[in-house]
Amino acid sequence: MMGHRPVLVLSQNTKRESGRKVQSGNINAAKTIADIIRTCLGPKSMMKMLLDPMGGIVMTNDGNAILREIQVQHPAAKSMIEISRTQDEEVGDGTTSVIILAGEMLSVAEHFLEQQMHPTVVISAYRKALDDMISTLKKISIPVDISDSDMMLNIINSSITTKAISRWSSLACNIALDAVKMVQFEENGRKEIDIKKYARVEKIPGGIIEDSCVLRGVMINKDVTHPRMRRYIKNPRIVLLDSSLEYKKGESQTDIEITREEDFTRILQMEEEYIQQLCEDIIQLKPDVVITEKGISDLAQHYLMRANITAIRRVRKTDNNRIARACGARIVSRPEELREDDVGTGAGLLEIKKIGDEYFTFITDCKDPKACTILLRGASKEILSEVERNLQDAMQVCRNVLLDPQLVPGGGASEMAVAHALTEKSKAMTGVEQWPYRAVAQALEVIPRTLIQNCGASTIRLLTSLRAKHTQENCETWGVNGETGTLVDMKELGIWEPLAVKLQTYKTAVETAVLLLRIDDIVSGHKKKGDDQSRQGGAPDAGQE
């Protein structure tokens, strides 16, 4: 039987790689992704300019925003990009560090795989190290008083210093803190801070960044439906609808056969009566403003205008929800079911202004707004987009601290403290596992090392003295000053990071490294059609998965 030709199990147009080749390929892909955004860490970080497929320009130093725009082929690189997105959604900050750490964890593992150490041994050491990293972090964390605004501004400032918005840091910190405190909502002892839904960022090009502010209420890009309606109302009574003030057409197509001329007049009269009834149901409650998600017919506008009611139509559902939270109104589906307690009376002012070429409706001075709008002004769209990304990060940091008021020192100090603890612990370990365990400590040093590199200081000299510093008693808050590249005590410098962000960064980085080390086989399949097309000179990537 030995002379027979081999049996092909896999289809001929699939490509298979296995063993060491796959592992080193995965590690190299992860290292490449980490190298792309290595220069984006710290206050002296560089920015990247990316062209998206539509020809738009993105200028940013936010790890997640950069990787979102990059097109990659390798599956391991795709999973690296995925973790930065997860980090952004979970805690909103630390997207750059998580990629750099994961890349470094894999990089130090390569040496052991070359020495024929089994990946499972490396993985089990990494898992042990992760548990110890988490316990060490909790040991060095300190509680924070969230009612102390100076401390809160300081924490947000640590996050903003590394961003493009750092020139206007005090303005940005105040905006982030005010916005998050405004949307904070406590119910049955449970805190809810939903920034995505209730803190909307509106960007209007023009003016200067210093004109940006937080509105105690909502701003929408809409004008009144009829030019003679009021555009300035104090203490407005607001009614919110999600139904249209138009004549309802039947669900399916209906034909009406008319035999007499009067019947046609009667049909038109019925339409008018229906709309009049809708408007009367609304007018009974004496509102000043009616806002609906659907359309308002000309006739309805006429009735509302005669009753001196301002109407705004086709408002987004998300905006309507925010207005409801801000002024205490309820969104009603049928005008005939409107009651007095559905009317929102919490707003202090409704005003429609023209900014540039467009009209904007401002519902502000709300008594107890649980929703807000951040109005950003700036020179160009690119700058505004970057400022918005930075603000989102700052708000997430603020939210994390309010939900879990624990802090750890920034500037690479926590990494060095954890690395020192792991190195000490590894001395008591026996067997092969101690080497990969110690390598995790070595991998953690990549954060302070990158900070030093990015501000152009001498890496070897500073890292050695930082290691020496951490061997002394009560020196776990010493780290790198990213501005000057010198060693400082983070307590004095006031650079703190939320514990939640650090924990998530470490967990995600180690889990990703473990996941990629577990892979020993990659089978990539292509559809036959795509291959045929590329042979004929068609689109090379058509039909490929």
Swiss-Prot record:
Q: What is the effect of changing residue 12 to R?
A: In NEDSVH; uncertain significance; the orthologous mutation in C. elegans results in reduced worm motility and a crawling speed defect suggesting a deleterious effect on function
Keyword annotations for this protein? Acetylation, ATP-binding, Chaperone, Cytoplasm, Disease variant, Disulfide bond, Hydrolase, Intellectual disability, Isopeptide bond, Nucleotide-binding, Phosphoprotein, Ubl conjugation
Give the matching Pfam families: Cpn60_TCP1
Q: Report the SS bond pairs.
A: 366-372
> Which residues are listed for Mg(2+) binding in this entry?
93
Q: Does the keyword Cell membrane apply?
A: no
> Which residues are modified to N6-acetyllysine?
222
Q: Which residues bind ADP?
A: 42, 94-97, 162-163, 411, 482-483, 497, 502
Instruction: Report the residues modified as Phosphothreonine.
Output: 430, 459
Crosslink feature (Glycyl lysine isopeptide (Lys-Gly) (interchain with G-Cter in SUMO2)) location: 15, 248-249, 381
Carrying Phosphotyrosine, the residues are 247
GO molecular function term, any single one: ATP hydrolysis activity
Look at the named UniProt entry and state the broad enzyme category this protein falls under. hydrolase
Looking at the record, which disorder is this protein connected with?
A: Neurodevelopmental disorder with speech or visual impairment and brain hypomyelination: An autosomal dominant disorder characterized by global developmental delay, impaired intellectual development, poor or absent speech, and brain abnormalities including hypomyelination, cerebellar atrophy, and optic nerve atrophy. Some patients have severe visual impairment, dystonic movements, and seizures.
Which family, according to the similarity comment?
Belongs to the TCP-1 chaperonin family.
State the protein's purpose: Component of the chaperonin-containing T-complex (TRiC), a molecular chaperone complex that assists the folding of actin, tubulin and other proteins upon ATP hydrolysis. The TRiC complex mediates the folding of WRAP53/TCAB1, thereby regulating telomere maintenance. As part of the TRiC complex may play a role in the assembly of BBSome, a complex involved in ciliogenesis regulating transports vesicles to the cilia.
The family database entries (NCBIfam families) matched by this protein are listed as: chap_CCT_gamma, thermosome_alpha, thermosome_beta
Can you name this protein? T-complex protein 1 subunit gamma
Q: Native species of this protein?
A: Homo sapiens
The lineage is: Eukaryota, Metazoa, Chordata, Craniata, Vertebrata
